């Protein structure tokens, strides 16, 4: 978003580790700015392979019994092993689509675009088995939901992605800026 400020007035809402449902719950506040368009960048936190569902994690964190159970499970079987076996996502595909539609309804009078989730490298897949399948699935949901308003990042070069597999480098930010501007020009924005 920072690089877009040379061409557009930008109101940015970012939440590290944020889920799409949290973006939807804040949409009313974003709407007060009367934006000309919305560009959504979410999905990796929603679809990433996890040991436990979001509700399970909240239970573990909310009380002493949950914390003890979580500690025992993680001691007996590592969280990584549980994750690799269960491959849970914090947002189900059905809920992901439902939240997308809710967000689009909130901004029904303006164009709503979405960035695809970054492609998964072999290294990232080896660290988090199953992530490639999940990302492809959720990208397909984004494509179905946004159609020609999806900004496809699938051809980003690996130099544009940090070693963690899901954050952008300086080159990656430049690439995304180029892709956003190309798409906005198609829509005369």
Feature annotation, model-predicted:
Residues 1-38, 143:
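Serine-esterase "nucleophile elbow" of acetyl-processing enzymes
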Residues 25-189:
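Alpha-helical cap/lid subdomain in secreted, periplasmic
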């Amino acid at each position: 978003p920072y690089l877009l400020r040379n061409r557009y007035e930008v109101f940015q809402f970012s939440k590290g580790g944020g889920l799409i449902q949290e973006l939807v719950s804040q949409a009313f506040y974003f709407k007060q700015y009367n934006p000309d368009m919305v560009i959504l960048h979410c999905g990796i936190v929603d679809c990433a392979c996890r040991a436990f569902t979001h509700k399970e994690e909240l239970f573990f964190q909310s009380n002493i019994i949950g914390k003890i159970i979580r500690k025992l499970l993680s001691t007996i079987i590592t969280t990584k092993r549980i994750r690799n076996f269960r491959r849970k996502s914090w947002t189900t595909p059905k809920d992901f689509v439902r939240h997308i539609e809710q967000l689009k309804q909130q901004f029904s009078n303006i164009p709503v675009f979405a960035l695809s989730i970054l492609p998964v490298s072999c290294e990232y897949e080896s660290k988090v088995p199953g992530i490639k399948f999940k990302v492809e699935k959720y990208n397909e949901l984004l494509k179905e939901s946004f159609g020609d308003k999806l900004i496809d990042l699938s051809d980003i070069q690996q130099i544009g992605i940090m070693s963690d597999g899901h954050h952008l480098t300086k080159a990656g930010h430049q690439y995304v800026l180029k892709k956003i501007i190309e798409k906005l020009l198609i829509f005369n924005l």
